[in-house]
């Protein structure tokens, strides 16, 4: 046998995926046929001794040596499960390393086996090979009974272990949790075995095996008659007997004969289940006989073979057992509110015990005592004693029926799970369909028997005997059958519709027949039965019409009947009161029961009234509003009156009235007036809250009264008037009349909440029985939630932008009054009190270990928990609005005629967060609930945690580095389990949209608690698996820590991989793409943050994260579809469809993913360049840039940029044009379907604007031509249009932003590869050329429409070209230029010429073009090609460059002049320098020369403070300009042009050349802080340069004067010394700067004396240069000092 769960899990998954693995099925077939059995592998000495030797051999032949710890774990598991020790070892080895996981593997294996077998048996046709393989050799059929028995054995062993633990005082929480775990699995197994058994019957696998049928019946008969597990066999038996035609005739007759004998057995009465099954066999036997009358019916004697045995079975309790089957599986019996009505079931169940899950209980005796169904006639006797049935002090019938029974449960029974067992959906379906067929068969084929029973009962009543209700109920089998129908069909409209679908049917005829019953008990049961057939709108309408059209039993008759009884009881109370007064004077006791009987008020009357109320309540529950209104007119007044008299059915009457409450709030006035009058009209009230609460307790005297009242109150304050997609009441509306109670009490709704909170909820924990407690808690929590939703909080925030007058929008006198009336305010007030919020917290504090599984009826508990967490979440959402806005309004402006408790305040709570943080177990439970399957519970728990985290991060009080939530989660005992809960939720299968939304919220929670830069540890670090002690680490090798390999971080990586796996290049769906993006964002944040980056990178490298994700990295082409739709913006309609669907979500998510992944790669390579070896770095880099196999992977990252922009919106808005909508507030929709944005907040604002303007339509500002209705319609249309419009804007902006981010990240990645990638110069230069080949076409395109994108790529090109130049110098550079660079140069020229280019972009183009020209000048062929292309467009080019040089600010001035320099050099190679010609044709050259004066002006601005950066920039520009002019001066024509453009005149005007070399220049710098001064005065001379910083060369005067003298020399040399005019001008210049010339020569003489001529000091070298220039000029011009 295979003991690992893995092969069965694999087979199960193959079934789920729709691709059944037949080979694996054949391999595990023996295990499947063996079901859950391991009876041949129980613990034994041989295996134990082998294990204790330390070496074991597994079933597959492999051997292991094991240590003592492992041996101990294996023995422990073996003892607990009574399992072979070697098998225990195999289970542990197949799972994780603990016995607990071995146990999980054991039960999971069994679970998978049974699920697979059930699927094959029930879903495959009996002729299929798969099914035939499974049942061949009969092993499966022969094992199924043993499988059931094996579970009995294991449950029995569990009980023994419990007894042992209790004796040893080891029965702790952990032990109990372990027991519950095993019982849960065994219960599921039993349920699935039931399905398998049914399937085998259905497929006929056991139909020819009468011995098996009899042994199965014997097995069921031997079970205790109160064992709920009997129910699991009933679907198979019912279906078996319904399929008698499939059995051989001889077998049917043999069964018939056997059952006849069994009924005559004296001991048969002890086996009621067997009697009931035999009865059902006979019911079907009649039909079987009818199918072939000649061979079957004619050979039988109907009386002896059918009638008498069936009658005998009825007398032995067959119908009572059927009633128990129906009642203990009914939905209605699980509804505690049904106990408001008379518990007629206890009356009619006289002989047979109810079913209890006895095999799942620790102590069934306690449970049996508390659920004993035997009717106790003493209760009736008690009622007949002194107090009497209708005595005002009588506490109510409930004390003798179900509720009292439950209230009397001992405390410890509440600790039990399994108080209610619910069948799984599949088993339930089999059970319901087969049981329905049983009941319909009895109605159809056993009419003779029902008539016989009815006649016998009526004869008994007519016999004249004085029969008590107790006597009647003993033989009331027809009533039992009616009740069976009631319990079975109630709340199952899909089955009960059979009775109404055809008026000619036997089912409808049965109802007609029943309606003619005259006996009171029969009539009562008839009304109950019909009430069960009214569930569902259609059935309710049928019942409504049935009584409406029935002359003998009409609705009016029923109402009259209720009214008559009301008068009788009222008269009885008066009569009793008078007699009591008389008796006091005569000293005689009054027998109130005798008085009641005189008035005809006995227990039957209670039953009858209860059945009428049940009928009315059931019909009114689901009918439409028109029918409800009609019934309300008939019954409301009658029922109102009924509640005024003290009866045990007041609560029931309240429940029925609650069903009559109309949906429309304005129609509820009558109900409110009645209820308010009932409670307060006759009460003595004063100013105290206690007097108001006493008014309630005087009216609501019993548990049932309170329960009924709560249901009525909940329906009365329920919200119907709400806007679309909103759960809040329309602002300004109330669910009750304004100034409720005016005239006889303090007005308002507050007294109701005061009573509910202080008298009920605050004391609810005193109710012992858990089901009773929940029955009260549930309506109260619903009331609280409804109350919180009764105020639209968004209106206060939106009132200013909407220009709303709140007084005009409310139904009250003004807004302040509305606030005082609204239910939300009292609810907030009471929730802020400790006893109330603790009561709500107690609901949540049940803990994940006490959650009931679905099979044990966990629905009510789940609903309670859901409500409790939703309430907490809602309170946290709006508590600030209450504290800051609503509370002060009531406090300051509250009117005195309204009810307001004296202690109205915030009750010491600054914030509701404080209440939660003080309850540490609550916070821990919320963490654990994140992992449960219940989406509502998990989602709301997570949202509360998100708020708590945000609060504790941002609170002023929290100055410590650890926030409160992190501290709590890290310190509680459940810390590891909380982390495991998050892991479980993230790893759960995505079965619907809700699960997906929850995963995304969980990932958002983690992301929001992570920072890119902060070194503070957060809750996300803990949850992800870091150890967050003083120093963060990957933690120990324990589960949930990263080091162990089973952490939330690992789950995150798995989600990322799984999501990418489901994406192809053909189609990218929104959901997986969004999941992948969210997961990667978290990993990226951890890698960015210095706190975690080092730890995480080492872990990710070990896990081969780079390789795993790169393999799955999604690629896109122009044919890729996005969530099924192509990116097509060719038409407005296609673009609209794309944007308003999930497609745009898929597209944007992909862009975000691509951005994150590119960023990650850049960070990763940069990080590993420091820590890894050269070969390791190159491995990763080559993966990205290698092109040996296919195109470079790196370049595919830019593929998304090939898509065009999303087209701009063309909708025009009118109503919402000037609305101040903040598009940044619009978030992503939590669900991945439809429009991807959540416009909830925006819709609220637009809705308010629409309402305000509609109300103002007739004011001056609005046209009277539009009606209010028309305006509202137009506004609704425009609201839809607005959402479409904003969807487009947001999507377009987001796409542009993300595209730019992708590009920016890619640019950074390329830069990192080039600088940190450890590439050889030749490889790197080739890679750079490939990059140029990719980006140049893109630059060319982007220049025309997207400058921002161009700037990114051009800045990259500048960066790369610089490195390329350096690399080429290291490689033997032959002076040729790679042809691929020419396209770059052309693109630069195109960019410079583009009117869209920014100054910064042009500056980069100048640099690139200059780099290229610098290289091409040494290449003759290249130079000529460039010259040819430039000649054509040189005029415009020169104009643009010149413009930047002369008028530009920033780098373009310098880069432009450098490019002009290179262009001049290039043009010098042609006959005519067309560049220079272009400059000379206008004043361009003159203006360039004049720009030298800018520097002069800056240096002479002694009154202004100079910025150091400005100085350095200006000096750079000055030198660049001078060197450009020198370049121009290199030719005679150029020098001549300079002279013509006043070069020498401008030089003569430069003040800094006239400076005294000894005194120097005085400069004033700001932005330099010295002592108390904000500026600094500095003197710069020839000897003392200005040092800007310690690493830079100083700024010397030589920086300025050397270039100028070089320029003068260049002009003079080019013009020649024969040009007298030039020589004379230069002579004049030397004379002008005579002081400077003398100063330089002086310094030269001093140097010679000090022998510093050859010093390497930069200043010294500049002096040498200057001396040479002056000497040369003096020589060429013949200048003498005396000149």
Curated annotation (Swiss-Prot):
Superkingdom as given in the UniProt entry: Eukaryota
InterPro entries for this protein: Nup186/Nup192/Nup205 (IPR021827)
Pfam family, one: Nup192
GO CC terms of this entry: nuclear envelope; nuclear pore; nuclear pore inner ring; nucleus
GO biological process: mRNA transport; nuclear pore organization; nucleocytoplasmic transport; protein transport; regulation of nucleocytoplasmic transport
Subcellular localization(s) per the UniProt record: Nucleus, Nuclear pore complex
Molecular function (Gene Ontology), one example: structural constituent of nuclear pore
UniProt KW Cell membrane keyword: no
Keyword Translocase listed: no
Predominant localisation class: nucleus
Coiled-coil spans in chain: 31-58
Alphabetically ordered keywords of this record: Coiled coil, mRNA transport, Nuclear pore complex, Nucleus, Protein transport, Translocation, Transport
Family of this protein: Belongs to the NUP186/NUP192/NUP205 family.
Summary of subunit composition and partner proteins: Component of the nuclear pore complex (NPC). NPC constitutes the exclusive means of nucleocytoplasmic transport. NPCs allow the passive diffusion of ions and small molecules and the active, nuclear transport receptor-mediated bidirectional transport of macromolecules such as proteins, RNAs, ribonucleoparticles (RNPs), and ribosomal subunits across the nuclear envelope. Due to its 8-fold rotational symmetry, all subunits are present with 8 copies or multiples thereof. NUP192 interacts with NIC96.
Job description of the protein: Functions as a component of the nuclear pore complex (NPC). NPC components, collectively referred to as nucleoporins (NUPs), can play the role of both NPC structural components and of docking or interaction partners for transiently associated nuclear transport factors. NUP192 is located to the NPC core at the nuclear membrane and is essential for de novo assembly of NPCs.
Other facts noted in the record for this chain: Present with 2520 molecules/cell in log phase SD medium.
Protein name: Nucleoporin NUP192
Gene transcribed to yield this protein: NUP192
């Amino acid at each position: 046998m295979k003991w690992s769960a893995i092969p069965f899990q694999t087979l199960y998954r193959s079934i789920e995926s729709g691709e059944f693995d037949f080979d694996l099925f054949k391999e595990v077939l023996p295990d499947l046929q063996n079901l859950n059995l391991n009876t041949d592998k129980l613990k034994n000495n041989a295996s134990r001794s082998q294990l204790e030797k330390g070496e074991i051999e597994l079933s597959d032949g492999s051997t292991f040596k094991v240590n003592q710890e492992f041996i101990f774990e294996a023995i422990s598991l073996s003892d607990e499960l009574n399992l072979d020790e070697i098998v225990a070892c195999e289970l542990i080895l197949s799972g994780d390393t603990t016995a607990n996981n071995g146990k999980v593997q054991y039960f999971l294996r069994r679970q998978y086996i049974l699920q697979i077998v059930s699927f094959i048996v029930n879903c495959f046709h009996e002729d299929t090979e798969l099914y035939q393989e499974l049942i061949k050799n009969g092993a499966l059929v022969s094992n199924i009974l043993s499988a059931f028995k094996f579970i009995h054995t294991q449950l029995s062993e569990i009980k023994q272990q419990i007894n042992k633990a209790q004796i040893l005082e080891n029965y702790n929480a952990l032990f109990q949790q372990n027991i519950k775990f095993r019982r849960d699995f065994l219960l599921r197994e039993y349920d699935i075995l039931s399905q398998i058994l049914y399937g085998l019957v259905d497929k006929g696998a056991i139909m020819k095996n009468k011995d098996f049928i009899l042994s199965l019946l014997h097995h069921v008969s031997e079970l205790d008659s109160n064992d709920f597990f009997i129910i699991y066999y009933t679907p198979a038996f019912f279906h078996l007997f319904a399929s008698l035609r499939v059995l051989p005739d001889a077998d049917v007759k043999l069964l018939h004969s056997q059952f006849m004998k069994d009924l005559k057995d004296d001991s048969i009465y002890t086996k009621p289940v067997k009697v009931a099954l035999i009865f059902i066999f006979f019911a079907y036997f009649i039909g079987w006989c009818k199918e072939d009358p000649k061979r079957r019916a004619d050979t039988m004697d109907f009386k002896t073979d059918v009638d008498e045995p069936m009658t005998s079975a009825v007398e032995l309790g067959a119908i009572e057992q059927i009633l128990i089957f129906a009642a203990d599986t009914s939905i209605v019996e699980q509804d505690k509110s049904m106990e408001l009505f008379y518990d007629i079931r206890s009356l009619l169940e006289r002989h047979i015990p109810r079913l209890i899950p006895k095999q799942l209980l620790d102590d069934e005796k306690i449970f049996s005592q508390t659920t004993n169904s035997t009717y106790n006639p003493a209760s009736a006797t008690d009622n007949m004693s002194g107090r009497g049935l209708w005595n005002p002090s009588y506490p109510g019938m409930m004390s003798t029926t179900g509720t009292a029974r439950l209230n009397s449960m001992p405390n410890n029974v509440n600790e039990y799970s399994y108080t209610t067992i619910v069948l799984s959906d599949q088993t339930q379906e089999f059970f319901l369909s087969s049981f329905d067929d049983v009941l319909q068969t009895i109605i159809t084929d056993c009419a003779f028997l029902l008539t016989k029973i009815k006649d016998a009962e009526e004869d008994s009543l007519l016999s004249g005997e004085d029969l008590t209700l107790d006597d009647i109920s003993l033989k009331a089998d027809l009533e039992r059958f009616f009740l069976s129908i009631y319990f079975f069909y109630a709340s199952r409209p899909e089955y009960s519709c059979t009775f109404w679908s055809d008026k000619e049917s036997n089912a409808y005829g049965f109802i007609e027949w029943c309606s003619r019953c005259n006996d009171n008990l029969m009539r009562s049961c008839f009304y109950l039965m019909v009430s069960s057939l009214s569930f569902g709108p259609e059935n309710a309408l049928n019942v409504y019409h049935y009584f409406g059209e029935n002359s003998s039993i009409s609705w009016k008759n029923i109402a009259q009947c209720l009214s008559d009884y009301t008068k009788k009881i009222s008269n009885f109370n008066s009569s009793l009161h008078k007699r009591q007064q008389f008796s006091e004077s005569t000293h005689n006791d009054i027998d109130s029961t005798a008085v009641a009987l005189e008035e005809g008020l006995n227990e039957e009357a209670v039953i009858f009234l209860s059945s009428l109320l049940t009928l009315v309540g059931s019909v009114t529950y689901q009918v439409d509003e028109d029918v409800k209104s009609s019934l309300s007119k008939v019954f409301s007044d009658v029922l109102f009156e009924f509640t005024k008299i003290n009866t045990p059915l007041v609560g029931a009457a309240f429940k029925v009235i609650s069903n009559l409450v109309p949906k429309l709030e304005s129609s509820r006035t009558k109900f409110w007036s009645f209820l308010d009058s009932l409670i307060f009209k006759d009460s003595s009230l004063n100013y105290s809250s206690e007097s108001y609460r006493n008014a309630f307790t005087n009216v609501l005297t019993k548990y049932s009264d309170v329960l009924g009242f709560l249901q009525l109150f909940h329906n009365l304050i329920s919200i119907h008037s709400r806007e679309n997609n909103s759960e809040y009441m329309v602002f300004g509306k109330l669910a009750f009349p304004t100034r409720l109670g005016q005239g006889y009490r303090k007005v308002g709704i507050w007294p109701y909440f005061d009573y509910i909170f202080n008298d009920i909820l605050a004391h609810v924990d005193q109710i012992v029985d858990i089901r009773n407690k929940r029955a009260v808690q549930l309506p109260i929590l619903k009331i609280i939630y409804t109350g919180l939703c009764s105020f639209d909080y968004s209106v206060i925030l939106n009132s200013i932008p909407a220009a709303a007058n709140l007084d005009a929008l409310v139904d009250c006198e003004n807004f302040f009054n509305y606030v005082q009336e609204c239910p939300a305010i009292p609810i907030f007030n009471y929730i802020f009190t400790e006893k109330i919020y603790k009561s709500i917290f107690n609901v949540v504090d049940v803990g994940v270990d006490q959650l009931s599984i679905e099979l044990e009826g966990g629905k009510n508990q789940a609903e309670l928990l859901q409500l409790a967490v939703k309430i907490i979440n809602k309170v946290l959402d709006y508590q600030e609005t209450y504290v800051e806005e609503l509370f002060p309004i009531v406090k300051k402006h509250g009117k005195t005629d309204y009810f307001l408790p004296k202690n109205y305040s915030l009750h010491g709570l600054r914030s509701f967060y404080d209440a939660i943080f003080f309850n540490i177990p609550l916070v821990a439970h919320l963490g654990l609930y994140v992992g449960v399957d219940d989406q509502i519970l998990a989602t709301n728990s997570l949202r509360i945690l998100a708020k708590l985290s945000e609060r504790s991060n941002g609170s002023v009080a929290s100055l410590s580095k650890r926030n409160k939530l992190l501290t709590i989660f890290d310190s509680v005992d459940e810390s590891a389990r909380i982390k495991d809960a998050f892991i479980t939720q993230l790893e759960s299968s995505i079965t619907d949209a809700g699960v997906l939304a929850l995963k995304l919220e969980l990932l958002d929670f983690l992301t929001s608690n992570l920072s890119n830069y902060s070194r503070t540890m957060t809750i996300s670090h803990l949850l992800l698996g870091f150890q967050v002690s003083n120093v963060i680490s990957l933690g120990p090798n324990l589960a949930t820590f990263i080091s162990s390999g089973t952490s939330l971080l690992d789950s995150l990586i798995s989600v990322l991989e799984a999501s990418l796996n489901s994406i192809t290049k053909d189609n990218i769906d929104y959901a997986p793409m969004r999941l992948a993006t969210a997961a990667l964002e978290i990993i990226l944040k951890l890698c960015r943050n210095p706190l975690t980056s080092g730890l995480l990178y080492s872990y990710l490298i070990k896990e081969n994260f780079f390789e795993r994700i790169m393999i799955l990295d999604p690629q896109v082409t122009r044919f890729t579809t996005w969530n099924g739709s192509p990116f097509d913006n060719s038409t407005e309609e296609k673009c609209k469809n794309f944007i308003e669907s999930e497609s745009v979500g898929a597209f944007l998510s992909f862009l975000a993913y691509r951005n994150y992944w590119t960023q990650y790669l850049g960070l990763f390579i940069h990080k590993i360049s420091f820590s890894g070896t050269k070969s390791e770095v190159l491995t990763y880099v080559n993966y990205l840039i290698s092109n040996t196999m296919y195109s470079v992977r790196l370049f595919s990252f830019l593929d998304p940029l090939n898509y065009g922009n999303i087209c701009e919106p063309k909708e025009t808005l009118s109503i919402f044009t000037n609305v101040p909508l903040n598009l940044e507030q619009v978030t992503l929709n939590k669900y991945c379907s439809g429009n991807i944005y959540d416009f909830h907040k925006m819709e609220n604002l637009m809705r308010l604007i629409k309402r305000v303007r509609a109300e103002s339509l007739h004011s001056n500002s609005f046209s009277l031509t539009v009606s209010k209705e028309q305006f509202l319609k137009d506004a609704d249309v425009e609201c839809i249009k607005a959402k479409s419009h904003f969807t487009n804007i947001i999507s377009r902006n987001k796409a542009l932003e993300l595209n730019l981010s992708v590009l920016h990240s890619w640019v950074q990645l390329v830069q990192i590869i080039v600088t940190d990638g450890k590439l050889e110069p030749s490889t790197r230069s080739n890679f750079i050329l490939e990059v140029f080949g990719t980006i140049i076409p893109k630059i060319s395109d982007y220049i025309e429409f997207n400058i921002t994108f161009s700037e990114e790529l051009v800045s990259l090109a500048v960066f790369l070209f610089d490195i390329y130049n350096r690399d080429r110098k290291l490689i033997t550079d032959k002076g040729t230029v790679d042809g691929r660079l020419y396209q770059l140069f052309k693109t630069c020229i195109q960019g410079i010429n583009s009117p869209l280019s920014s100054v910064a972009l042009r500056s980069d183009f100048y640099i690139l073009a200059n780099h290229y020209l610098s290289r091409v000048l040494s290449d003759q062929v290249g130079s000529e090609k460039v010259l040819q292309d430039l000649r054509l467009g040189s005029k415009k080019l020169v104009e643009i460059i010149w413009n930047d040089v002369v008028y530009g600010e920033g780098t373009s001035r310098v880069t432009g002049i450098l490019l002009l320099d290179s262009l001049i050099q290039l043009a010098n190679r042609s006959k005519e320098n067309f560049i220079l010609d272009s400059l000379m044709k206008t004043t361009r050259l003159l203006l360039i020369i004049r720009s030298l004066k800018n520097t002069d002006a800056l240096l002479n601005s002694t009154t202004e403070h100079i910025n150091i950066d400005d100085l350095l920039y200006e000096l750079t520009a000055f030198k660049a300009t001078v060197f450009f002019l020198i370049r121009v001066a290199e030719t005679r024509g150029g020098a001549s042009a300079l002279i013509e453009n006043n070069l020498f005149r401008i030089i003569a005007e430069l003040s800094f050349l006239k400076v005294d070399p000894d005194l120097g220049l005085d400069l004033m710098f700001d932005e330099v802080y010295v002592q108390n001064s904000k500026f600094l005065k500095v003197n710069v001379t020839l000897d003392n340069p200005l040092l800007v910083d310690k690493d830079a060369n100083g700024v010397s005067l030589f920086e300025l004067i050397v270039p100028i003298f070089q320029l003068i020399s260049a002009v003079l040399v080019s013009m020649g010394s024969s040009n007298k005019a030039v020589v004379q001008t230069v002579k004049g210049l030397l004379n002008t700067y005579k002081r400077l010339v003398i100063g330089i020569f002086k310094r030269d003489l001093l140097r010679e004396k000090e022998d510093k001529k050859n010093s390497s000091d930069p200043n010294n070298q500049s002096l040498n240069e200057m001396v040479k220039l002056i000497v040369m000029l003096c020589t060429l011009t013949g200048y003498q000092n005396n000149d």
